[in-house]
Amino acid sequence: HLAHSYYDEFGLPTCSLRPFNVYGPGQIGGGAIRAFIETILADDDLVIHGDGSQIRAWCYVDDLVDALLLVLERPEAVGEVYNIGNPRSVVTVFDLAMRIRRLMGSDADVTFRPLHYTDVEMRIPNIDKARRELRWEPLIDLDEGLAKTIAWYRERQPAPA
């Protein structure tokens, strides 16, 4: 809101993007995808908080970068807000864990732990405005993005002693 207030008050050109569940190589901080990949690489069991039915739409980092570049190039994006995500990459957290397990050739067991916080059950972006005004479309589907992300983590895994 602060950036848009400066736009309204002082004419400072701003644009806001609302990214939905961005993942990919170089990811820092938390996140289910990073946690699942690192857990499998460590040969540990996968841990899912809650029952795994939470629904998420995952957006590969390259698609987010494409959207950022588009808003920088379009003066008509000034003052606007866009949802950026991939509604074609919608899965439950449990299904995500199983996909990653399959793509990594793992047979890791899954452990469910109680959820100790309130979680949003479903996060799916409506990207119609970004499609219409920016001509933006996410290009990387979930399995392709996961494969690239897994490869990145594997390349950085320390060699066995």
Regions found by a protein language model. Give the residues of each.
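Active-site Tyr-X1-5-Lys
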Residues: 1-15, 41-42
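Flexible, glycine-rich beta-alpha linker
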Residues: 12-31, 55
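A generic local structural motif
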Residues: 1, 33-34, 109-111
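C-terminal substrate-binding subdomain of Rossmann-fold SDR/epimerase-dehydratase oxidoreductases
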Residues: 40-161
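Short switch/coupling loops within ABC ATPase nucleotide-binding domains
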Residues: 5, 21-22, 135
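Hydrophobic alpha-helix immediately C-terminal to the catalytic Tyr-X-X-X-Lys motif of short-chain
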Residues: 2-6, 36, 96
